[in-house]
């Protein structure tokens, strides 16, 4: 892989190195940086699939490539782990506004990573690179979620990450993971109700035995 380090001015290299070092020691919730000491323009990370989404329980490897025009031009983002998502093409390319028209030179790598993680919670079918995933998201959410879970189970099994980031715009403290009336929400609510009912039944039997 060709490195862009020699194409970047020294002050940009120092900026990137500092931010990657900070992200490595203090990563956002559900994100782990994998430093590349030989090429800091190749930023690879593991992103934990957010709870309440079809990607929950998965660990997704992705990378940002910082081009020679960075930070005037946005980095390019790719998922290395196969994923069924409207905004990720078959070759892993990520389509999100912050990597295109909404990019600003002052935006950092942390902001980009949090935006990509947020995309797992709130897909945007209007800018779909995977047309089938975008169509299913709009027309048949249950089928979309089933396909996404299957891909997650096959390709994205990994170890859970720990730690919370108060700056994460998609954290449970600031943004609900799914709407209360969505198919996933109903499923989880039903599972919880069944478990509570079973527990109450068991507790009642134990109480009767003591009488």
UniProtKB/Swiss-Prot annotation:
InterPro entries given in the database record: Ub_conjugating_enzyme, UBQ-conjugat_E2_core, UBQ-conjugating_AS, UBQ-conjugating_enzyme/RWD
Region called Disordered, residue ranges: 158-211
Pathway: Protein modification; protein ubiquitination
EC number: 2.3.2.23
Family: Belongs to the ubiquitin-conjugating enzyme family.
Function: Catalyzes the covalent attachment of ubiquitin to other proteins. Acts as an essential factor of the anaphase promoting complex/cyclosome (APC/C), a cell cycle-regulated ubiquitin ligase that controls progression through mitosis. Acts by specifically elongating 'Lys-11'-linked polyubiquitin chains initiated by the E2 enzyme ube2c/ubch10 on APC/C substrates, enhancing the degradation of APC/C substrates by the proteasome and promoting mitotic exit.
Protein's name according to its UniProt entry: Ubiquitin-conjugating enzyme E2 S-B
Organism: Xenopus laevis (African clawed frog)
């Amino acid at each position: 892989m060709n490195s862009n380090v020699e194409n970047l001015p020294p002050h940009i290299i120092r900026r990137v190195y500092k931010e990657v070092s900070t992200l490595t020691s203090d990563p956002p919730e559900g994100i782990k940086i994998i430093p590349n000491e030989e090429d800091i323009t190749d930023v690879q990370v593991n992103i934990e699939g957010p709870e309440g989404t079809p990607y929950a329980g998965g660990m997704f490897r992705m990378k940002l490539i910082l081009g020679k025009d960075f930070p005037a031009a946005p980095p390019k983002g790719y998922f290395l782990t196969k994923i069924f998502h409207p905004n990720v093409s078959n070759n892993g390319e990520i389509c999100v506004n912050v990597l295109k028209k909404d990019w600003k030179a002052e935006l950092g790598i942390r902001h980009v990573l949090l935006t990509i993680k947020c995309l797992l919670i709130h897909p945007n079918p209007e800018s779909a690179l995977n047309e089938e995933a975008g169509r299913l998201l709009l027309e048949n959410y249950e089928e979309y979620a089933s396909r996404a879970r299957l891909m997650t189970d096959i390709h994205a099994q990994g170890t859970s990450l720990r730690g919370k980031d108060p700056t994460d715009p998609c954290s449970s403290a600031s943004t609900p993971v799914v709407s209360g009336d969505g198919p996933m929400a109903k499923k989880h609510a039903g599972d919880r109700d069944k478990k509570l009912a079973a527990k109450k039944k068991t507790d009642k039997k134990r109480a009767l035995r003591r009488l």
